[in-house]
Amino acid sequence: LMRMPSTSRIHFIECGANTGMEWGGVAVPTVQYTHGMLSCCEFTGVPLATLLDACGADIGTRGGEDRYILAEGADGSSMTRTISMKAALDDVMVAWAMNGEMLRPENGYPLRLVVPGVQGVSWVKYLRRIEVGDQPWDTKDEVLHYVDMMPDGMFRRYTSIQEVKSVIT
């Protein structure tokens, strides 16, 4: 992987729970827990579009709007996330380095999916598998967790945008 054309980019990553003080029983009600679950790093890796092309993956038509990827981590819960092919072809990378050095275990060593503009949970750590398909996957992480409750009581899944919630000065 490291022999392929690589790129380095600076990105912000933010936990979807940042500012989540409405949760009951927060252990330590500090600024770090209230607004500090984010960071800015330089990631180095191979653009996912380059990998998909090298593998001969069918990216679909209409700029990838009709295809999806499944990213799976090798962590204890086998964290999985569905990402639209359109997003995957845009700015997503498979990173092996952070801030000029190899990823550390706490940051997803040996590989991490970097997905700018979405919740940090979609930046799959310990990446072990990427699959391409024609519809989103119904994994436990996208059916039971990380869904958005709508005013009408329905749930929205596969949320792909993380609005800015924090200010850094």
Q: Residue locations for each model-derived region?
A:
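Short, conserved helix/loop micro-motifs enriched in His/Cys and acidic residues
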Residues: S6-C40
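Short, glycine/acidic-rich beta->alpha junctions
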Residues: Y33, C40-T44, G63, P105-N107
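Secondary-structure junction/capping motif
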Residues: G36, V46-P47, S84
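Stable alpha-helical elements in mature extracytoplasmic
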Residues: T44-P47, L51, W123
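Short Gly/aromatic-enriched secondary-structure transition segments
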Residues: L1-P5
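Extended, aromatic/histidine-rich regions of cofactor-dependent oxidoreductases associated
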Residues: S6, I10, G25, D53-T169
